[in-house]
């Protein structure tokens, strides 16, 4: 345990393994912001899926939405385990995500455009999580 904060678990072991814990917390906070923003965004997109085709898309978007919520909550747990905290200001938190692309399409009921937005969001998540995987590989079996 950390000498400076007895509530933080395993920090010294992670540092001994060569992990920059502060950088990891920073990346986890950014990923939490991305996942939270994506959850909000997918919730909004789902509401615009109307008609026969739209009803079919709702299930796909719901799966992505719930996955993003789960990832957000997982990030939170690990951030606090590592001694980090989230910003108190929700606007600041969302800005950290850098998710300007997460806007409704010009035509908010254009199902193809909605799917393209979903795909872009998921591609971004893969890049973000790969960065964390590379950072923690062989150093942090929990994250």
Indicate where each model-derived feature is located.
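Acidic, low-complexity proline/glycine-rich segments
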Residues: 1-12
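Mobile beta-alpha loop/short-helix "lid" or hinge segments that flank ligand
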Residues: 5-7, 90-97, 131
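Glycine-rich tight-turn/loop motif centered on a GG-T
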Residues: 17, 53-63, 101-109
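Glycine-rich anion/phosphate-binding loops
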Residues: 23-27, 69
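Acidic/histidine-rich alpha-helical segments that form the ligand environment
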Residues: 27-34, 38-41, 45, 77-78, ...
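Conserved alpha-helical segments that form or flank metal/cofactor-binding pockets of metalloenzymes
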Residues: 38-92
């Amino acid at each position: 345990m950390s000498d400076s904060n007895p509530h933080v678990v395993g920090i010294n072991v992670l540092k001994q393994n060569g992990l920059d814990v502060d950088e990891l917390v920073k990346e986890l906070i950014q990923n939490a912001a991305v996942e939270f923003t994506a959850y909000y965004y997918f919730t909004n997109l789902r509401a615009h899926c109307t008609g026969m085709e739209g009803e079919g898309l709702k299930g796909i978007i719901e799966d992505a939405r719930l996955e993003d919520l789960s990832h957000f909550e997982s990030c939170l747990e690990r951030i606090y385990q590592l001694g980090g905290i989230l910003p108190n200001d929700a606007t600041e938190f969302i800005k950290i995500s850098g998710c300007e692309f997460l806007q409704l399409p010009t035509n908010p009921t254009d199902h193809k455009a909605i799917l393209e937005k979903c795909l872009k969001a998921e591609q971004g998540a893969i890049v973000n999580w790969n960065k964390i995987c590379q950072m923690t590989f062989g150093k942090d079996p929990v994250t």
